[in-house]
Amino acid sequence: MGGKRLPTVKPGGGGGNGNGKWSNTPNVGQPDTLKEALGTKGKPMSVYEAVRGANPYYDGSYKEFSENCQRAVIATEARMRGYNVTAQPTYKGDKLPNTAYVNPKTGVSSAFWQGAFKGAKQEKTPTQASVESKMKEYGNGSRGILQVQWKGGGGHALNVVNKGGKIQYIDGQIGAKYNGKELFSKIKSSRTQLTRTDNLKFSDRAKKSVEVAGSRTNSKKVVAL
């Protein structure tokens, strides 16, 4: 699968379009421990494998798996580390999609999804050039999560990868990637923040975001884009 390429889609489709509804499908309980959530570590997955399998129950008609980007980014990162996991769904009253704190001096915010990592730190990256400069500074093979706000309303989180010096904007929620120039034309640049993730350890709170692939039996599987 290493040679396969992700489909490139128009920015704005991830993060839910606000038209989804809550399903009547019973949710599967969260794993009790981080070890249970991650399962056994295997061979790191390619970008293609990680992204295409991160959120297999995606369905734009329902909120659970079309507004769970805060979990899909964790699943995508975990898969690139070698864990065969998928994203858990969001749910009514879920706090993970929310902003936890905004520094009044710097304007840099902290999001609840960051709790899946130990020592996660967001940096303001208001332009495509600033994101790519940071990623190149981190080095080949580095990975991060980009938090954005769409100009049309709503927010989103996606993964960023430095592969051979080329920066890729990948979206495990919908199983696709974005053109960087198009992406930045659709987002509020002042609200864009980058968190490096490849050098961080998972915290116990990551168990709220991922589950071993195939452990969910009460959901209809929907193939991503």
Q: Which residues make up each language-model segment?
A:
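Generic secondary-structure transition motif, activating predominantly at the C-termini of alpha-helices
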Residues: 38, 42, 55-58, 117, ...
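Tryptophan-centered short beta-strand motifs
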Residues: 5, 22, 120-122, 167
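Short coil/turn linker and secondary-structure boundary residues
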Residues: 29, 45, 108, 123-126, ...
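Compact soluble domain cores
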Residues: 70-138
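Active-site or metal-binding loop neighborhoods of secreted/extracellular toxin and effector enzymes
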Residues: 121, 129-225
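Low-complexity, glycine/serine/proline-rich disordered segments
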Residues: 1-80, 95-97, 196-225
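Sequence-level detector for tyrosine residue identity
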Residues: 48, 57-58, 62, 83, ...
